[in-house]
Amino acid sequence: GYVPQQLEFDRSSPVTVMDFMAASLSPVPVFLGVGKRTKEKVRAALARTHCEKLEKRPLGALSGGELQRVLLALALTPQPDLLILDEPVSGVDQNGLESFYQTVDELKRTNHMAILLVSHDLDVVRRYADRVVLMQGTVVRQGDPETVFDSDEFAQVFYTRGGRA
């Protein structure tokens, strides 16, 4: 499954969360109507990410955090072996960020899936990652968060002229 940094779409579109998700999960075109089984699949997916109350809301009316949780629900249907999160909380407020990562952490623990998180937020990485790959063009260092954060390579990447911190 894949959750992008952001989804580009016409925010004035009347497409609801149900329509959006059903378009990906339905065996028939959504314009023919959303079937009962598809609605059940959508509701179950939304429940996994604690956003079942959003199904009737227009996609463009969602906050950044709500939209990312809907995208997470879609990425989890069907359940993947690997979930890729590409800067998934870019532009999301602090409450949305915490809620998103708590949901991801819960899913990781209960479903035993591998999660690849691309992030520049070192606090999030330190808090939620089991393993870290530090890159600057190529792999510079890898290991558990503390080992990587305490390394000379980390200091060189983030605290020297070539780094961005």
Where are the language model's segments positioned?
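Conserved ABC ATPase "signature" region
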Residues: 36-54
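Conserved ABC ATPase signature
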Residues: 58-62, 66
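Conserved catalytic motifs of ABC-family nucleotide-binding domains
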Residues: 79
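Catalytic Walker B motif of ABC-type/P-loop ATPase nucleotide-binding domains
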Residues: 83-87
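H-loop/switch region of ABC-family ATPase nucleotide-binding domains
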Residues: 119-120
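A short, surface-exposed alpha-helical micro-motif characterized by mixed small hydrophobic
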Residues: 125-127
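Conserved beta-strand-loop-alpha-helix hinge in the C-terminal portion
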Residues: 138-161
